[in-house]
Amino acid sequence: MGAAAAEADRTLFVGNLETKVTEELLFELFHQAGPVIKVKIPKDKDGKPKQFAFVNFKHEVSVPYAMNLLNGIKLFGRPIKIQFRAGSSHASQEVSLSYPQHHVGNSSPTSTSPSRTVDNMTPSAQTIQRSFSSSENFQRQAVMNNVLRQMSYGGKFGSPHLDQSGFSPSAQSHNHTFNQSSSSQWRQDTPSSQRKVRLNSHPYVMDRHYSREQRYSDLSDHHYRGNRDDFFYEDRNHDGWSHDYDNRRDSGRNGKWRSSRH
């Protein structure tokens, strides 16, 4: 394989570009898929940039991954269209694989899409795609956040870092929701007897929440009646003593009155 063919395998064609898109912006965008050597936007005779560009990667495996990750992303409201460069081995594999799928009987319009053809590439490309397939949506969001931030502030395009700030709030909310649901479920699953035991463990709960009759409800009827009879017995003795005292006082008075008459 010659040097030109090797460079073609590491290059992507990016079309449908807005006139505001610059080489620095494309460098920052495609750097999310792997190390980028250079980005070239050709110009016409008048010096105006054309609506397509070439992105050259350092590693060949970054080419199919960049197509799967960034194809269709909108820049300034216009979705970009990524294709393999003509003459590369990726483009020839895409053409050769599209015909067997068509003759098998799969008439789906997405049978020849880049995402389907990438799955049938070399084992190294398949391994990379499988390793990133689970986090593809997160990486696409991170790429757009990074690009929008660069476009908003107009900063210099250097070595990019994935913006992970969009992931932490969802993780915290999930943890918070899980903690609330688990705590509420624990409160619902706790038996009522255990809650009563915890309430009765406080030394003053009984005095606060129960009246005198409820506090003495555990006493036996015999003991309660015995105490009540004792009080009545004392009352009867007191009444009997006062009655005898009144009789003696009355009899004494009557005796003196009788003695005085005689």
UniProtKB/Swiss-Prot annotation:
Mod. after translation: Phosphorylated at Ser-133 by MAPK14/p38-alpha-activated MAPKAPK2/MK2; this phosphorylation is stress-dependent; this phosphorylation decreases its RNA-binding capacity therefore affecting RNA nuclear exosome-mediated degradation. This phosphorylation mediates YWHAE and YWHAZ interactions.
Key words of the record: Acetylation, Meiosis, Methylation, Nucleus, Phosphoprotein, RNA-binding
Polar residues composition bias: residue spans: 165-194
Keyword check for rRNA-binding: no
GO molecular function: 14-3-3 protein binding; RNA binding; single-stranded RNA binding
Segments for region (ZCCHC8 binding): 25-35, 59-76
Keyword Acetylation: yes
PROSITE patterns: RRM
Organism, as annotated: Bos taurus (Bovine)
Alphabetized InterPro entries for the sequence: NEXT_complex_subunit, Nucleotide-bd_a/b_plait_sf, RBD_domain_sf, RBM7_RRM, RRM_dom
Listed GO biological process terms: meiotic cell cycle; regulation of alternative mRNA splicing, via spliceosome
Domain comment, as recorded: The RRM domain mediates RNA binding; the RNA must have four nucleotides for efficient binding. Mediates the interaction of NEXT complex with promoter upstream transcripts (PROMPTs) and potentially aberrant forms of other non coding RNAs, such as snRNAs. The RRM domain exhibits specificity for polyuridine sequences.
Assembly, per entry: Component of the nuclear exosome targeting (NEXT) complex composed of MTREX, ZCCHC8, and RBM7 that directs a subset of non-coding short-lived RNAs for exosomal degradation. Interacts with ZCCHC8 and SF3B2/SAP145. Binds to MTREX through ZCCHC8. Interacts with YWHAE and YWHAZ; these interactions are stress-dependent and RBM7 phosphorylation dependent; release RNA from the NEXT complex and may affect RNA targeting to the nuclear RNA exosomome for degradation.
Protein name as annotated: RNA-binding protein 7
Omega-N-methylarginine: residues bearing it: R149
Organism lineage string: Eukaryota, Metazoa, Chordata, Craniata, Vertebrata
Modification N-acetylglycine occurs at: G2
Location relative to the cell: Nucleus, Nucleoplasm; Nucleus
Biased composition range(s): Basic and acidic residues: 242-253
PANTHER family per the UniProt record, alphabetical: RNA BINDING MOTIF RBM PROTEIN -RELATED, RNA-BINDING PROTEIN 7
Segments forming domain RRM: 10-87
